[in-house]
Amino acid sequence: MARLQEYYRSTVVQQLMEQFGYKSVMEVPRIRKITLNMGVGEAVADKKIMDNAVGDMQKIAGQKPVVTKARKSIATFKVRDGYPVGCMVTLRRVRMYEFLDRLVNIAIPRIRDFRGISGRSFDGRGNYNMGIKEQIIFPEIEYDKIDALRGMNITITTTAKTDAEAKALLAAFKFPFKN
């Protein structure tokens, strides 16, 4: 069992039950999945760029990403229907908790000029989105071996009904919110 998963079961559940007055343990919000998405628009010109992006994503997530393809042709962007334009990974269970642990304790503190993550990026249904500008904040990526700095979106999907519940859940996991 992952360290954060054990921490959730032993500490976070009790803390949230007291804070929100839940009657059952099953009412307590939990993290359902974490989705990493990397858009690689430059891959239209060179297929090697997509291979490098997939390799970086695989190192970060510990799981093989799915290559996302364009749904329709757009002449302005020189994109045709079916061209690879990005990659994504959905993490669940043990890998999800291990990634969350690395994200909160190692990767986020390595962001340049870091002053805390925004508490406004909730979607109204208890899910949190954040963007990362550089993949080199993760320790798995070696700075010398990358061809370009690429950003990614990280979506944390929870079972929380409201943003306040989701923020309390992520704060219990020691997310460094600004305020």
Curated annotation (Swiss-Prot):
Q: Does the keyword Acyltransferase apply?
A: no
Q: Which Gene3D superfamilies match?
A: 3.30.1440.10
Q: Is this entry keyworded Transport?
A: no
MF terms from GO for this chain are: rRNA binding; structural constituent of ribosome; tRNA binding
Which GO biological process annotations does it have?
A: translation
Q: Which domain of life is it from?
A: Bacteria
One of this protein's Pfam families, by short name?
Ribosomal_L5
Cellular compartments per GO CC? ribonucleoprotein complex; ribosome
Q: Which SUPFAM superfamilies match?
A: RL5-like
Q: What UniProt keywords are attached to this protein's entry?
A: Ribonucleoprotein, Ribosomal protein, RNA-binding, rRNA-binding, tRNA-binding
**What exactly does this protein do?**
This is one of the proteins that bind and probably mediate the attachment of the 5S RNA into the large ribosomal subunit, where it forms part of the central protuberance. In the 70S ribosome it contacts protein S13 of the 30S subunit (bridge B1b), connecting the 2 subunits; this bridge is implicated in subunit movement. Contacts the P site tRNA; the 5S rRNA and some of its associated proteins might help stabilize positioning of ribosome-bound tRNAs.
Family according to the record: Belongs to the universal ribosomal protein uL5 family.
Describe the subunit structure: Part of the 50S ribosomal subunit; part of the 5S rRNA/L5/L18/L25 subcomplex. Contacts the 5S rRNA and the P site tRNA. Forms a bridge to the 30S subunit in the 70S ribosome.
Name of this protein: Large ribosomal subunit protein uL5
Q: Which organism is it from?
A: Nitrosospira multiformis (strain ATCC 25196 / NCIMB 11849 / C 71)
